[in-house]
Amino acid sequence: KKALEKIKSILEKGGAEVIEVKDDRVNPSKEEILVLMYEFKIGLEKYLANSNSPYKTLKELIDYNEENKEKVLKHFDQSIFIESDKTSSKKSEYLRALDVVLDSRNQIDKLINENNVDALVGLSWSPAWEINHDGGDDEAIAKQRFWVNGGRAAMAGYPNVIVPLDLVDGLPIGMSFIGTAWEEKKLIQFAYAFEKINGFFPKPKM
């Protein structure tokens, strides 16, 4: 809450009118993951086909990892590889999911146009979480405060300019300026003005 209040205060200090935008739509994370898994296999195998690697398919990489698991799977499994390899038979599901994901463009456009705003702003990501070799990211994230913004912009292929905001729990967090297609120049101008007023440029502690 304090971070959001800081964003509002800086924006108003810079002459912006801040309008609260309500968006209660659920992020299509299930569809997003299916699209990611499906396209990951295609992209990886296209890369491997033109590389010097002796392995040309995702399945060959999975088999190699399994054969050498004591060395290469010491900390993490390869469940993402395995799930991605299963998507070859899911083209129709992929196409439906892709339609849902790409509809994020319409959702962002609608929020901007209906509320007559130049950009959508909000907190970007929560502080970085600790590496958990046993439980992975999910378990690590569960132990701390977590939020995320900008996923819909990523799915839409729309610009999302992130600038430093403040420290939370001793770790840096950022804020996002999200816009519609081809609005990069305007968003960068907003972000630059925000950074000048905020003046938050922490030096890392070694």
Regions found by a protein language model. Give the residues of each.
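Short helix-loop capping/hinge segments that flank enzyme active sites or metal/cofactor-binding pockets
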Residues: 38-104, 162-172
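Structural helix-boundary/capping segments
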Residues: 5-13, 49, 154-206
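Short, surface-exposed loop/helix-turn segments at secondary-structure junctions
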Residues: 95, 129-150
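Short glycine-rich anion-binding loops that position phosphate/pyrophosphate groups of nucleotides
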Residues: 50, 125-128
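Stable alpha-helical elements in mature extracytoplasmic
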Residues: 3-7, 40, 93, 104, ...
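Gly/Ser-rich, acidic/histidine-flanked active-site/gating loops
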Residues: 1-53
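Conserved acidic residues
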Residues: 116-118
